[in-house]
Amino acid sequence: MAKKVEKIVKLQIPAGKATPAPPVGPALGQAGINIMGFTKEFNARTADQAGLIIPVVISVYEDRSFTFITKTPPAAVLLKKAAKIEKGSGEPNKTKVATVSSDQVKEIAELKMADLNAADVEAAMRMVAGTARSMGIIVE
């Protein structure tokens, strides 16, 4: 018989840098997960993606065991990396902070395709372009 899922915890953690300190420790402690076990496994799985923020969905079972799925980094993080900026614009409609090419947007859309509910790459590109617009990044 399959184990019953007791709780689902969603976090966004920098790749390879999960530590028992807040915010990871308290969130996992409340769910009853072995914090050190999770941090070691997460860091090992995401070591090759250093510098990116990785969303993770942790399923906690009745017997306190857990499994987790890592997702692709948020579009905003990938756009900031592509545009080589620290943060988006405070006033996206007035001040533009950077530009990205449509090729870069397509690359990000293809990477994010698994996590987006888009029918094709074109729709995914429109979603990524919308995120860029809301950050004050111009898509050329």
Curated annotation (Swiss-Prot):
Read off the PROSITE patterns from this record.
Answer: RIBOSOMAL_L11
Q: How is it modified after translation?
A: One or more lysine residues are methylated.
Query: Keyword set for this entry?
Result: Methylation, Ribonucleoprotein, Ribosomal protein, RNA-binding, rRNA-binding
Alphabetically, which GO biological process terms does the record hold? translation
User: What does the entry list under GO cellular component?
Assistant: cytosolic large ribosomal subunit
Question: Gene3D superfamilies, from UniProt?
Answer: Ribosomal protein L11, C-terminal domain (1.10.10.250), Ribosomal protein L11/L12, N-terminal domain (3.30.1550.10)
Q: Name one Pfam family in it.
A: Ribosomal_L11_N
Function field: Forms part of the ribosomal stalk which helps the ribosome interact with GTP-bound translation factors.
Entry protein name: Large ribosomal subunit protein uL11
Name the gene. rplK
